[in-house]
Structures are given as C-alpha cells and as structure tokens.
Amino acid sequence: MCWSSQVSVAMMGVGTAAALISYHRKDPAAIWLTLGYFSAMEALQVAGYAVVDQCGTFENRAVTLASYLHIAFQPFLINAFALELVPKAAKDRTKRWVFAVCGLSAAVMIAQLVP
C-alpha cells in the first residue's frame, strides 16, 4: 500500500491518465493494460484503507480476495510489458515459456485459496 489513501488516490489518477495517454498513442496493448492494471491495484488499496481493521466483514474479505487475485495475475502483465521492451526475436522465442511460468505461478497462488 502507499503511505496513505490520499497517495493511493493520486497514484490511481496518474496511472489512469498514463494508461489513457498510452492507449490513445496506440502503444502496444501490453503497455497501456499494465498501466491500467496497476491503477486498478491502487483502487484496491483505497478500498483496503476503507475496510482496514474490519476483519471478518464481507467488504474486508472481498477487498482482500480481489487484492490477492490481482497479485496472482500480476506476473502476466509485468512480463507482457517487459516483452514489449525486448527485440521481437527474443519476444517470439520466449513468450510461451514466460506465460507458462506465469500461469503456473497463478495456479499455485489460487490453489492456496482452497481450504
């Protein structure tokens, strides 16, 4: 989480603006989607501040689950972004393996939710 809910709101706004600018510049989808994904993370953090210390409430549990799932799928976005920064040959050679490992990581994290 950021230092405060106000900082999270500011980062959410900056990130959303950056994602929209990137989208309108017609940057690769991996760029603007990653910026948008991290803006959504800031929104989850703002929601988390609203329910902090309210353990056991539906709202707290929902925000916590959404945050956990957000983290589980982060590797897909981070690596898609990174693959846009490397030469096409390297991207084409590695993307299947990279996303397979991301999928394995997400599966392990989601499996931990099973009681």
Regions found by a protein language model. Name each.
Residues 16-25, 83:
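Hydrophobic alpha-helical transmembrane segments
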Residues 46-53, 75-85, 110-113:
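Transmembrane helix-loop junctions and nearby membrane-interface residues
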Residues 44-66:
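Helix-loop junctions on the outward
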Residues 81-115:
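Membrane-proximal helix-loop-helix units in multi-pass membrane proteins
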Residues 1-15:
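Hydrophobic transmembrane alpha-helical segments in integral membrane proteins
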Residues 26-35, 93-98:
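Membrane-interfacial loop-to-transmembrane alpha-helix junctions, especially the N-terminal start
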Residues 38-41, 67-77, 102:
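Mid-membrane cores of alpha-helical transmembrane segments in multi-pass membrane proteins
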Residues 33-49:
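Hydrophobic alpha-helical transmembrane segments of multi-pass membrane proteins
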